[in-house]
Structures are given as structure tokens and as C-alpha cells.
Amino acid sequence: KPGHGGHKGQLERRLHMVRSLWTAATGMIAQQTNVDTIANNLANVNTTGYKTQVNEFKSLLDQNIQTKTTSANGDTKPSSAQVGLGVRNASISSVFKEGSLTASDSDTAFAIDGKGFFAVRGADGNTYYTRNGNLKFTLASNGGNMLATSEGLPVLDTQGRPIVLSNNYVMSKITVSKDGSLCYPDAQNNPQPIGITIGVFQFNNPNGLERLADSLYQQTAASGQAINEATNNNVERSSIIQGYLESSNVQVVDEMVNMIVAQRAYELNSKAITASDEMLQQANNLRR
């Protein structure tokens, strides 16, 4: 049929341009998520114990536009022709590199030197984990003084119980050794353990933890069960440093560079959409 091949070729070209529109759109969506992640890192640059998040990408399926075949003289071509269909966000992972330690005037400021996490009891009764050691003593519901987070969540000891001290202790005199033992001065003003130790827990895969609000993490199947440093001799134990807080590990300069790269990638993908749209309009005009 006359002209049939020409119409078919025009249709294929238009389909290819529509494909480029969607491919560039996936790039814009991925870079928008990347910018969102970077903005969140910068917003938490002063959040105690915050861990930088990194956006990871994965390419979408490639489409075969020509399979392996032979040339005019019968020789086999070495490869096929494939075109990519875009990109997607594969994961947003946390970088659990330790942040720098900042001195604090608070007696209940604690930093963890190592891979461990503090354990806290949530309002729903579940156990959550955090690197934020900005703690305080509050009045317990059944009397005494309870070690808690700034949100009022009880901090747990090595037995998984809330840390509650009787009113016989002067809270300002409580000290904590590097192994997490709570100590109180004797008559000679020498600190003596009182039989309570702050719990510190590790995970085989901390990147598998689910991030929650208030710098909390929740255990998942991907993270594995919490490992109690006090009862497991196969892990390198962390140290608790009183009078210090762990700063966010966000590197502002790195995030600004990442922001510029993401912005440029977003801009180039938008230009690809504009170019594809103009080419599609020109192809449509050929039919007139």
C-alpha cells in the first residue's frame, strides 16, 4: 500500500519521542527525591545523633530496539541495540559514621563511642533505639527519679527495665562510667556502682532499622534482633561518655555539592522533556 511504510516510520519516531518524555520524567522524579533527602540532611545538621541519609538509584529495564542479527553479508553482529527506560530510587540508606562529640553542661548528657544505641520504652510499650543521649531525670509515676529522653520516654537498663532511682540519691551526684554503670559517691567521695547499668545495644545491619520521629529507630527483620552488649561477648563494646553529646554527622559542604549536582541533573532532564516535546510537535506537523 503506497505510503504505508512512511506512516509506520513516523509512528515509530513519535513513540520513541514519547519514550524519551517518560525517561526524562523518571529522572526528574528521582532527582526531586534526591533534593528532598539532601534538604532533610541540611535541616538536621544540628540534631543530636542524626545520621546522614544517602539516596541510591537504580536503572529501569532496557528495551530492545534491535536484537542480535546478521549483516548484509551474513556476518553475525556482536551486540544488540538497547535503550534505557529511565531511573528510579532504589533506597535511602543511613550513614552510621559517628558524629563529632560536643561538650555539654548537663550531667545527663551522654555520647556513645562505638556502634551501640540506647534503648527506650515507647508510649505504646514497644522498645525503640536512639543515638541521642540528651537525657534527664524526671519524676517516675510510682515515685523516685527516672532517666528519660527529652520527650519523656524511659531509658532502659541492660535488663530492658526503666532506670528508676529512689529519692535517697541526689541526682546531681550521679555519675556514669564508660561501661554505663551508674555510680554514687561514698563517704570518701569515691564513686561506687549502685547496681544499675545503662543498656547499650547493637544491630548486625543498622541500615535495616526503620527511622521514626524524634531520632528513634525501630527494629525490623532486615536489621536483625538487638544485640545486648552486656551479655554478648562477640561484639566490640561501646563506651558511654558523660558530659558530651554526639553531633549530627552531616557534612554541610558535601550536601551543598550534592544539591548542585542534583539541581543540574533535574534541569537537564527538564530540557530533555522540552526537546522531546518540540520534536514531537515537528513530527506531527509533517502530517499536514
Spans of features found by a protein language model:
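Active-site anion-handling motifs in enzyme catalytic cores
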Residues: K1
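Amphipathic alpha-helical polymerization modules
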Residues: H4-R288
